[in-house]
């Protein structure tokens, strides 16, 4: 359990190019954003609040007893939306906030707790996040699976869509065998292992409010990974290594049907 109280904020944007109206998509009788909030409510959070960009999301949350605030519809990112939510909620600068994505209806409550606990455990970190060991070469080479390399203290060196860390002397399956051997030889040093980044974040509210004012990083623009902005500007990101694979998120109609099947079984 976390060593300090924390608030879960769930960004919810009605428009989606691949799945219009995604936050309100029905999953076994409940809007998806309500499902996410209910899962987050099983964590140790003192409160869970949806940061919505449309009145229809706020109304759906209210109908199911979920707290929500209405934010501007012109935010460029979920982080910008949560920064406004911090202001609307009057959070103090040292308050811990966990960003749970609004398309993760199967997120594990204990993962939320673990990511929230990173900041009290690692005072030098501005952000916390999570990662899981990659178990296939296909995932390692898939640009839609974001990788992270960590140092011996569990801080992120870099995030990339490319296969990192790269073994210069090997390729393909030979690389995979070399990486597995290196990870086994140094189990206390997660930087040797290929790790999949999980898109959950913790911040102190003061840092979250300042994040939109940081200039975008060239690496962030190149990789389309917003967390690289923090590293570019010298901030540290602590990484929780979880032994459990993350539950499936919902980005496409096919993803939605898979999650519906799991929750209706």
From Swiss-Prot:
EC numbers for this chain: 2.7.7.38
InterPro entries given in the database record: Cytidylyl_trans, KdsB, Nucleotide-diphossugar_trans
Subcellular location: Cytoplasm
Enzyme class per UniProt: transferase
Main location: cytoplasm
GO cellular component: cytosol
Catalytic activity: 3-deoxy-alpha-D-manno-oct-2-ulosonate + CTP = CMP-3-deoxy-beta-D-manno-octulosonate + diphosphate
Highest taxon above the source species: Bacteria
Disulfide bonds: none
Cross-referenced CDD domains: CMP-KDO-Synthetase
Keywords of this entry: Cytoplasm, Lipopolysaccharide biosynthesis, Nucleotidyltransferase, Transferase
A single BP term in Gene Ontology: CMP-keto-3-deoxy-D-manno-octulosonic acid biosynthetic process
Pathway: Nucleotide-sugar biosynthesis; CMP-3-deoxy-D-manno-octulosonate biosynthesis; CMP-3-deoxy-D-manno-octulosonate from 3-deoxy-D-manno-octulosonate and CTP: step 1/1; Bacterial outer membrane biogenesis; lipopolysaccharide biosynthesis
Family statement: Belongs to the KdsB family.
HAMAP family with a match to the protein in the record: KdsB (MF_00057)
Function as written in the Swiss-Prot or TrEMBL entry: Activates KDO (a required 8-carbon sugar) for incorporation into bacterial lipopolysaccharide in Gram-negative bacteria.
NCBIfam families from the UniProt entry: kdsB (TIGR00466), PRK05450.1-5 (NF003952), PRK13368.1 (NF009905)
Protein name: 3-deoxy-manno-octulosonate cytidylyltransferase
